[in-house]
Amino acid sequence: MSKFIEPSVEEIKLEKVYQDMGLSDQEYEKVCDILGRQPNFTETGIFSVMWSEHCSYKHSKPFLKQFPTSGEHVLMGPGEGAGVVDIGDNQAVVFKVESHNHPSAIEPYQGAATGVGGIIRDIVSIGARPINLLNSLRFGELDNKQNQRLLKGVVKGIGGYGNCIGIPTTAGEIEFDERYDGNPLVNAMCVGVINHDMIQKGTAKGIGNSVIYVGLKTGRDGIHGATFASEELTEESESKRPSVQIGDPFVGKKLMEATLEAITFDELVGIQDMGAAGLTSSSSEMAAKGGSGLHLRLEQVPTREPGISPYEMMLSETQERMLLVVEKGTEQKFLDLFDKHELDSAVIGEVTDTNRFVLTYEDEVYADIPVEPLADEAPVYILEGEEKNYNTSKNDYTHIDVKDTFFKLLKHPTIASKHYLYDQYDQQVGANTIIKPGLQASVVRVEGTNKAIASTIDGEALYVYNNPYEGGKMVVAEAYRNLIAVGATPLAMTDCLNYGSPEKKEIYQQLADSTKGMAEACDILKTPVVSGNVSLYNETKGTSIFPTPIVGMVGLIENVDYLNDFQPQVGDKLYVIGDTKDDFGGSQLEKLIYGKVNHEFESIDLSSEVKKGESIKTAIRQGVLSHVQTVGKGGLLITLAKLSAHYGLGLKSLIDITNAQLFSETQGRYVVSVKSGKTLNIDNAIEIGLLTDSDNFKVTTPYTEISENVSDIKQIWEGAIAQCLTTQD
């Protein structure tokens, strides 16, 4: 008889306890069919987390199959802890993005901190040393005190973990809209570097080999965290605060260093982070990938307090833990290593030839499950979508007040400088950061070489909401352009798909169409998807977030020497590359004037993106250009203002466009500055002005003139977010 008081198999069925764990009636019946009997309490919990949306992708898996996952540089694609891409010289870059949305909505500091810790361990589990962190964040408008609290907590959590563990946060993006009220998006990305011969996989194989647990002792924090992340946020969500994990960056640092030492041992067979679904997912997934079985003796698991049941051990998401499989007879070598790093560790089981996942506690069986159905046979749901009716009429922008619109957009938190927030992150630790957070992708040198990794993280919501297919293409192209802007060759990408409930027809269609667009862009831009994450059910009180796909992309710079003088200077001429059209559907201008986005916009020309990108990259590397900036939210006038304010340079420009086109967001455009004495030879490049040593920012069109002090623009742009957060306290 069990020493733990739990519902019986009959009670689980009759009282539908499985529903509270996240299993539907049909899923419960499928579990019964797989087992040939009714599952006990621990088994029900194990299936519920492994078949949760967060772990199984049961609503998104058909769409993920569209993505190209192989390519010239890809060494390891989806299926492991992170993607791995070759960068030459027997080296590779390892990267991935993950969401921690629901936990951050309930406990913003810990939700964000553990999101950072988890993505770091994903990179380390491959054997790579992390070189930088990035993040993509979404919050509701800052006139709401709850959103202010969430923003402050998330930023402190990101900085608190990353700064303590010693990894620089070098790039990111933050946007604000009322559709994220109470449901922030916190997507964390990590990039690492590894030698080819050190690449690890999360696999359990070799009959009789031992399973080692290392890291923090298991507690009751984060139980059913994966299930919680697969539900809508409701008024009852606050009661699920225990589902939010607690991070310890100092233990995280010890675990990282110990793991990176352990991968040098030839006796290491496989390794995986204990992330979502904790010990359950790491162990069962390793067994599935190894084509083997596992027997775990749970009384050997290090626990924080007495009386923790097998159910709690298996579903706990206590942070800073790794699971290793090592060759039989070499266990002490690993235990001694972990002891040296002051980490708890224990041998908790062994690999078997049964293809079953068996859990015992003091010789009593608490679970006996076939591995493959548990890890790989979660139900997949193909639902019916519903196309959105597009508004093909045109809004009127002929009478806008250019100056008033300019300043309203400049100080909107989505467009305003994020330095007030990013300054809370350590951007330089490790001393390899070349380009810090600002107007472009970040660039981090590969230590001991003249190479560098450029990385960016970008998201799109308004355009995806307006037209999911075209918006999906746009978000991939935006990341591509940001890498081109620092002279990098884009290599591959990771994605995080943040959407509402897929059980709603319109949202399911958004997911279907946007991933189709993303896949098409990946094909044409040659940026395969090597890792990723899906976060659904992002809804609060029945209101869904905007569909928000996030793309993290990395690129290679073979020689960083050209970056030594890659900064705009007085006297540099300015050019815009790409046509400016009447593109206002989904723009910040449409949202500002009409309060919503509901109009079509032109499709993006991906072939043109490639041609322009190659030309610009060549011009950068040949030393022709001193700065490249993509034209993004707010349009050309805002882009020029940000350039001027960021570098403290005057600007004089003459542009032949209409007042409204100053704020058009036509895709595929760049603003470039050409070094004095150099000639730009790129198709469709139009000279629009030059940089000066004055404090004057002057833009003239046939219809208007903007003339403002650069110092005033800088003060408004850089001070907007701080003002929102301080005046509302």
UniProtKB/Swiss-Prot annotation:
Primary localisation category: cytoplasm
Enzymatic class: ligase
GO cellular component: cytoplasm
UniProt: Mg(2+) 1 binding residues: E98, N533
Subunit field text: Monomer. Part of the FGAM synthase complex composed of 1 PurL, 1 PurQ and 2 PurS subunits.
Recorded superkingdom: Bacteria
Any Pfam family hit: FGAR-AT_linker
Catalytic residues (positions): H54, H100
Binding site for Mg(2+) 2: D122, D273
CDD domains according to UniProt: PurL_repeat1 (cd02203), PurL_repeat2 (cd02204)
Binding site for ATP: Y57, K96, D495, G532
Record protein name field: Phosphoribosylformylglycinamidine synthase subunit PurL
One GO term (biological process): 'de novo' IMP biosynthetic process
Organism in which the protein naturally occurs: Staphylococcus aureus (strain MRSA252)
Residue stretches in coiled coil: none
Pathway annotation from the record: Purine metabolism; IMP biosynthesis via de novo pathway; 5-amino-1-(5-phospho-D-ribosyl)imidazole from N(2)-formyl-N(1)-(5-phospho-D-ribosyl)glycinamide: step 1/2
Keywords of this entry: ATP-binding, Cytoplasm, Ligase, Magnesium, Metal-binding, Nucleotide-binding, Purine biosynthesis
Binding site for substrate: S99, H100, N101, H102, R121, Q245, E317, T318, Q319, S535
Main function: Part of the phosphoribosylformylglycinamidine synthase complex involved in the purines biosynthetic pathway. Catalyzes the ATP-dependent conversion of formylglycinamide ribonucleotide (FGAR) and glutamine to yield formylglycinamidine ribonucleotide (FGAM) and glutamate. The FGAM synthase complex is composed of three subunits. PurQ produces an ammonia molecule by converting glutamine to glutamate. PurL transfers the ammonia molecule to FGAR to form FGAM in an ATP-dependent manner.
NCBIfam families to which the protein is assigned, alphabetical: FGAM_synth_II, PRK01213.1
Record localization: Cytoplasm
Catalysed conversion reaction: N(2)-formyl-N(1)-(5-phospho-beta-D-ribosyl)glycinamide + L-glutamine + ATP + H2O = 2-formamido-N(1)-(5-O-phospho-beta-D-ribosyl)acetamidine + L-glutamate + ADP + phosphate + H(+)
